[in-house]
């Protein structure tokens, strides 16, 4: 049961005295002292929850599966990320890092609501036509379909999407995660920008199963091979491979990312989360990674 926050000077002094804290000062000083104490307690509670859900290095949960995504979104030429991008295509590939293969695929187009008419630039870039998104479900319905798709694999995803609980990061995030699966994408933008924006626009709560730590494949590749950061084509060229399908089509981009992951697995690369996100403009790096960040000279 939550303790009632003291409001009067006498109540604050009694509460501070019970905690063995100073009761000197005016009401404002006493309130600040109480708030500081509450902040410290909240940080301690979060840290205890982290310890509960994190694992030791000896017993860490290694990633077995990646959920590879590459969303496409509405766009205007020259606007970049300042544009109010809405998701129009959402693929998800369930990839087995041990078997080095795709187990299952999810794919759906999404109907935008704020700016339902695609720009000529967007249609040219993605190849997605107006008639395709006009008959597509809205984002909330696609998200429910994706949840059902992932729930279908609850026998291998540990914990399942029904059970996962993500704790909000403090100053650092544990490198080892109590999950055998993680989201993965090309750079941070799919998760920390496009998806985060979509939840913000739709005023939807962000479920624990889609936020938290994820693998930024582009940065992960850079750190593993000690090379400058590059795009999907650049990563494929490392093995003499060519892009298959149409660039900037979400499902084709995701499949080519899976080819990169497969090659890295064949070279005994151990995948781990290197980024996290909680909501729009609330994201960051996971410190103490196995592959130290590479900074090209």
Curated annotation (Swiss-Prot):
Residue stretches making up the SAP domain: 4-38
Q: Which GO terms describe its cellular component?
A: cytoplasm; cytosol; nucleus
Q: Where do the annotations place Mg(2+) 1 binding?
A: 70, 72, 253
Compartmental location? Cytoplasm
Q: Iron-sulfur among the record's keywords?
A: no
Tell me what effect the entry lists for residue 252 to A: Disrupts exonuclease activity
Q: Where is the active site?
A: 72 (proton acceptor), 248 (proton acceptor)
Protein's name according to its UniProt entry: 3'-5' exonuclease eri1
The record's gene field reads eri1
């Amino acid at each position: 049961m939550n303790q009632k926050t003291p409001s009067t000077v006498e109540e604050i002094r009694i509460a501070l005295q019970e905690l063995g804290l100073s009761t000197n000062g005016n009401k404002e000083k006493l309130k600040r002292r109480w708030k500081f104490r509450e902040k410290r307690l909240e940080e301690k509670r979060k840290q205890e929850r982290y310890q509960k859900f994190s694992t030791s290095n000896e017993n860490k949960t290694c990633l077995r599966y990646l959920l590879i995504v590459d969303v496409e979104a509405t766009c205007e030429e020259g606007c970049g990320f300042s544009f109010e991008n809405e998701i129009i295509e959402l693929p998800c590939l369930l990839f087995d890092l041990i078997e080095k293969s795709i187990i299952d695929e999810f794919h759906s187009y999404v109907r935008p609501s704020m700016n339902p008419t695609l720009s000529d630039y967007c249609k040219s870039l993605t190849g997605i036509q107006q008639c395709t998104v006009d008959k597509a479900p809205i984002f909330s319905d696609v998200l429910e379909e994706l949840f059902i798709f992932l729930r279908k694999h609850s026998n291998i995803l540990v914990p399942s999407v029904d059970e996962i609980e993500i704790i909000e990061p403090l100053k650092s995030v544990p490198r080892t995660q109590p999950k055998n699966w993680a989201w993965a994408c090309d750079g941070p933008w799919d998760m920390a920008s496009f998806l985060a924006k979509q939840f913000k626009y739709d005023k939807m709560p962000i479920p624990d199963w889609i936020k938290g730590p994820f693998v930024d494949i582009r940065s992960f590749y850079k750190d593993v091979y000690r090379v400058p950061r590059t795009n999907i084509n650049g990563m494929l060229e490392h093995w003499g491979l060519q892009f298959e399908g149409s660039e900037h089509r979400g499902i084709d981009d995701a499949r080519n990312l899976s080819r990169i992951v497969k090659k890295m697995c064949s070279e005994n690369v151990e995948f781990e989360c290197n980024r996290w996100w909680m909501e729009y403009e609330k994201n960051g790096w996971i410190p103490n990674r196995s592959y130290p960040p590479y900074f090209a000279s």
